[in-house]
Amino acid sequence: MRVGVLEDDVDHAVLITQALHADGHSSEVYPTGARFLQAMVRETFDVLVLDWMLPDMTGIEVLDWLRQLEDRTPVLFVTSRDTENDIVEALRHGADDFLVKPPRRTELLARLKALKRRAESFAGVGVLAVGAFEFDPSSSSVRLHGELLDLTERQFQLALVLFRNPGRLLSRQYLLEAVWGLNAQVQTRTLDIHVSQLRALLRLSDNGWRINSVYAHGYRLEPLA
């Protein structure tokens, strides 16, 4: 799981990241809303952790910006604000969950994992049908107009991540961790080669799709205009 953390308090940021790393997850920490918003243009995360009070803006303002851009990444607020009105306001603006500082490590991890599972369940865990494509995670197989295509396991996993997120810009780091794992020593060039192979193997352009390369950011699967 890859987690983006918006937190200006160093001690709380360390608490959150240590809990994540000890459990085998990765994270990036941003101390201001401006730096976080800049990063969200190029980075991709499974879950976001937002503080409320920040040096330059509020976590609510950051959340509004994300939702206005139709970014549906699950959001957990971790804040010292603890009134019922605070919780209601965060949820009303699109937060998915709420924890009061300091969070207990086990509860923090449990809530983050639950948010990730919920997002994955909405994306679908069975056969994924997108246009003429059918992806079956149970057999790591993909069919195009009913024809079984010959893909390696890595090629299939990469295609599945892309087709589960059509229209979403996925960072290179996110794709590397999603397909090759957190600790894999894989160069970004390997990812680029796999993307190039997928374009041909899936016959994307002939079937109304393309994988758009966004310079210095990553890739986006999108329908042809």
For the regions a language model picked out, list residue spans one by one.
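Short, conserved catalytic or interaction motifs in soluble domains
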Residues: Q68, E120, G167, G181-A184
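Short, Lys/Arg-enriched segments at the junction into DNA-binding effector domains
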Residues: R2, K113-L169, Q173, L221
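N-terminal/domain-start alpha-helical segments
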Residues: M1-E120
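Short coil-to-helix segment of the ABC ATPase nucleotide-binding domain corresponding to the Q-loop/switch region
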Residues: T106, R168-V179
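Short glycine-rich hinge loops at helix-strand junctions in the catalytic core
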Residues: G24, P166, W180, D206
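Two-component histidine kinase transmitter core
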Residues: L224-A225
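DNA-recognition element of transcription regulators
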Residues: R104-R117, D150-L160, R172, Q185-L204, ...
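Conserved ATP-binding motifs of the histidine kinase catalytic
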Residues: D9, E147, Q187
